[in-house]
Structures are given as structure tokens and as C-alpha cells.
Amino acid sequence: MQDDRIIRETGAAARVAAIVMPVLDALGYRLVRVRLSAQDGLTLQIMAERPDGTMTVDDCEEVSRAVSPALDVEDPIDSAYQLEISSPGIDRPLVRLSDFQAALGHLAKVETSVMVDGRKRFRGQIVGCTGETLTIERDKVAEGEAPLAEIPLDAISDAKLVLTDALIREALKKDKEERRQRKKARRRGEKGGVGDDGTAGEEQPDSAREGPARSASEGE
């Protein structure tokens, strides 16, 4: 089943998303979020990732080179802007059903477009997620409120993880395992006399840590 985004943009950001999504798909990436910010001049942030959730600095640069010409042709924004390509980071936005399911047990902030249980903002541990409903265990329960909040997914306008020690530990563990797998694959290639790049040669050092990555360029 296709893992489409549940949370989407409106206005100019939606126009940008419609332009860049086919470009990202062709390169093997997927769109996380588009956001326009007026702070320090107009900045267009395009957040993307590979299907496995990774996004390196080189990936950001590749995406920037690919989407810039498409944006120049379509010109969805009237004024000059700075283009910023970034990875989701550890405290990432949650925009797909798979994002919410992968975040089970972690603390998150959620905003809704309509009132749910008398409020539009929630903060708590994600304890369940079906195809229709997100269940959060509130970290602070007001008098008269139930500990668990049942939030319809189609009512969510924004959601992101909250940076915690547990989230950092999980991210470091995942990063360590990814490094181990890359090193293992590289050694297999060397035993066969061919490296990952298709050429024979000595083992190359590990690349820089694949954390939140950014690449910025000027747009018009």
C-alpha cells in the first residue's frame, strides 16, 4: 500500500510540493514537508528523505540541483527566496501513517485543525495508531480530562517528535547499525575484488555521521 502523506501543505507551499514531488520520486527520495519562512528574508525549506529515513549532505545537494531548475521554470513564488534542502532530523515531523507507527512509545506534539476533546494542541506519548486514529497518553492531564486522547488522523494539521534522551538513544543505535551494515557490505565487496563503486581498491573510511543535513542555494 502506498504510504502517502497524511499532513499536507496549503497555498504557495502546496504549489511547491506539487512541483517537487515528481522530481524527488524520480531520484528515489520522498517529500516530508515544504515550509515558507519570512525570517531573515524569505526561505523555502524543502524537507526530504530516502524511503529508509536517511538523508545525507550529498543527498541534500543532489536534491537541490534537481529541484532548483523545476522551481525556476514553474516559478510558484512571486518574490526572491533562499532555497534550503534539509533532512527531517531526530525530532522529525510526522506526516505519514508509517511515521506515527514508527514513533510509538515516543513523546510528540500534535496540533489539529478542529477542536478535539475541547482543544487543538496535544503533547504526550504516542501509544497507538491505526489507519484512522492516533492515540496519545497526555503528559499533563487537566482536571476532567481523560489520560488518553483519541485524535482522528484527518484532523491533524501538524505533528512532530519531541527531543528526549530515549529518542536520541534510539537514533544513535540506528545510526550505529547502519554504519555496521555499510562496513559489512564494503568488506564483502573487497573480498570479491570489487568495491561498492564497482571498482577494485582499498577500503575507504566511513563517511561523516549521517545526522540532520542541510544544503542551501539561492532561488529567484
Curated annotation (Swiss-Prot):
Keywords: Cytoplasm, Ribosome biogenesis. Transmembrane segments: none annotated. GO terms for biological process: ribosomal small subunit assembly; translation. It comes from the Bacteria. The keyword Transferase does not apply. GO terms for cellular component: cytosol. Its main location: cytoplasm. Gene3D superfamilies: Ribosome maturation factor RimP, C-terminal domain, RimP-like superfamily, N-terminal. SUPFAM superfamilies: YhbC-like, C-terminal domain (SSF74942), YhbC-like, N-terminal domain (SSF75420). The keyword Cytoplasm applies. It is found in: Cytoplasm. Residues 173-220 are annotated as: Disordered. Belongs to the RimP family. HAMAP family: RimP. Required for maturation of 30S ribosomal subunits. This is Ribosome maturation factor RimP.
